[in-house]
């Protein structure tokens, strides 16, 4: 089980102890400590998660994201040095850069395939592949920049579209990249078409990844959930209300 941040458990115990032990003297302090522990245990859910937190990602899911992000980052950076003249002049061993780029692209699907061994990861893939009525409403409000809350489940419509596009784009980039890697296995028209698709799709992916990072920079709670695996319940209620309702606090 993923360990909780120390501040979560400490906050619960401190608040309960202060309320229970005040004005009772030395004996009351002991009773307050015991009461704090009992209150913290009662307030926690069955898996040890405090009521003000929600388990958003397991350890396996977080490592899938980290490995995929690392490989994607290497592929994008090496591509930039290979295709932009200003950066290409800075590289002394271009052939080594080509090899790193090729293998980072080939290995990119592996974290996703390894993640399929995780039940939680498969459940999240199922959520990402479902586009409900409220997702269309979320998308409409986002496109028209309508202010106010937008209803979504664990993943909003934007995240679902991003995940679906990136999954398909990685496969296209892998296929076209292999054609470019082994040019003598295919006719000239295939190589020409693959180069065209690979180059333009790479630019589009780069723009999307930059936008994805920009969204994450503006949302510290989302970053914390990816880093620790736990999301603040207030953030979940505001950004993903349907998912928060599926996981009510203990006792409700």
What are these regions, as identified by a protein language model?
Residues 1-13, 17-20, 24-252:
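Membrane-embedded alpha-helical bundles that constitute the cytochrome b-like, heme-associated redox core
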